[in-house]
């Protein structure tokens, strides 16, 4: 495969697939890079029992003339190129234009017991289940916030799990107000109705959240605070997720400007998805959480603009703006309860990679100082879990990103040619 592409797309989810297809249709030499073994991203992850959704298979079949670079993880940035970790070793891939379709990750908030075996993210357990992790007959509690809880519970039931309940932190009045607005997006209303129908018989509680998980070698029971008081449920698995956070590490390393919705950054783009860095575009969740429809539309737009076809991108703006309004509606109605930010006690592990408790982080004003003193954020996830949680808790924001973006071989790290000054990573 070549080491230079006219258009290089990072991320093979819905946005990346649309971007790669569109750019290739304009005659560009396109590379589509993703860390996973198959295209589709998190939302279109292959299900060992049911395959990928039809929309995903159709999108993948359209990748004519696109080099799909599976199992390729970005390590660092070079001059108009990315240093990646590939199955055969490290390689540098140059580009004329770069489209960031890096998606999002689940927001996990710490509470006592959240590191027990059997406690996962809601989306995380959904992904594990699709990959074949056995859940048949398991008693599962699903909790957190947003429509992802329903999708996760639906997948779990299809794979034979006994879903004991779905516990949504947003109050009932807010969720009902959101549901009434779905009439403006009929397709989403139909999708929501289908989910509720398939989940008939599963309790769906509002204004409720996990206070604590208990267990010896694994989770055994969970305390849930609800408007009616505290209740305890015995369970085998606990899946808790509080929505999504954009993946911006690569964009920050490239020097792209960021915008903020609350404590979490997303890539700042103009109407045609151009970032502050010449030749770099951002599509989908990287530019702010918007959902599947936004990702597909913005991916197509980025593919048009990156190949010099801005008129075609302009034609998609009305649809994109409509879907972005849905994302804003979702953010407003599922805003997090302030009580969720004070669940962790002094002994709660915040950085599970390096076993750092909340009390060990007292007195630090920035992430860099905390990292130097405690190793918080220096594990395999590179602060994606603990750093994001700490930003949500108001401890210190994540500003900047360091190489490696993902774990890499020592030989790869030794060969890095671009290491910006330490000032570029203050706060990371």
What are these regions (language model features)?
Residues 2-380, 384-427:
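Residues forming the flavin
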């Amino acid at each position: 495969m070549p080491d230079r592409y006219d258009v290089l797309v990072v991320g093979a989810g819905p946005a990346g697939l649309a971007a790669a297809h569109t750019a290739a249709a304009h005659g560009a030499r396109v590379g589509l890079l993703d860390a996973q073994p198959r295209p589709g991203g998190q939302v279109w992850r292959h299900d060992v029992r049911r395959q990928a959704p039809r929309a995903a298979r159709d999108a993948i079949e359209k990748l004519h003339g696109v080099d799909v670079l599976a199992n390729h993880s970005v390590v660092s940035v070079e001059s108009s190129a990315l240093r990646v970790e590939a199955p055969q070793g490290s390689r540098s891939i140059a580009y004329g234009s770069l489209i960031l379709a890096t998606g999002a990750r689940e927001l996990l908030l710490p509470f006592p017991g959240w590191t027990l075996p059997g406690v996962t993210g809601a989306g995380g357990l959904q992904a594990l289940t699709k990959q074949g992790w056995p859940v048949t007959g398991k008693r599962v509690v699903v909790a957190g916030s947003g429509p992802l809880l329903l999708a996760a519970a639906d997948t779990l039931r299809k794979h034979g799990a006994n879903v004991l309940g779905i516990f949504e932190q947003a109050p009932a009045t807010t969720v009902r107000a959101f549901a009434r607005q779905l009439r403006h997006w009929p397709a989403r209303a139909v999708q929501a109705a289908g989910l509720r129908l398939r989940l008939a018989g599963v309790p769906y509680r509002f204004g409720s959240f996990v206070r604590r998980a208990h267990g010896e070698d694994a989770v055994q029971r969970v305390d849930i605070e609800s408007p009616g008081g505290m209740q305890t449920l015995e369970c085998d698995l606990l899946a808790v997720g509080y929505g999504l956070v954009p993946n911006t590490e690569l964009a920050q390393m490239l020097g792209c400007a960021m915008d903020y919705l609350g404590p979490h950054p997303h890539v700042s783009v103009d109407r045609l998805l151009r970032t502050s860095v010449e030749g770099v575009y951002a599509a989908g969740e990287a530019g702010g959480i918007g959902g599947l429809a936004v990702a597909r539309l913005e991916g197509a737009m980025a593919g048009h603009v990156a190949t010099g076809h801005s008129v075609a991108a302009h034609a998609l703006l009305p649809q994109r703006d409509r879907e972005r309004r849905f994302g804003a509606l979702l953010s407003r109605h599922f805003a997090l309860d302030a009580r969720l930010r004070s669940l962790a006690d002094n002994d709660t592990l915040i950085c599970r990679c390096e076993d750092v408790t909340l009390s060990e982080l007292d007195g630090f004003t920035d992430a860099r100082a905390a990292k130097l003193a405690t190793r918080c954020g220096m594990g395999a996830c590179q602060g994606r879990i603990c750093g994001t949680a700490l930003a949500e808790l108001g401890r210190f924001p994540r500003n900047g990103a360091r190489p490696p973006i993902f774990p890499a071989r020592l030989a790869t790290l030794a060969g890095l040619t671009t290491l910006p000054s330490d000032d570029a990573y203050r706060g990371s």
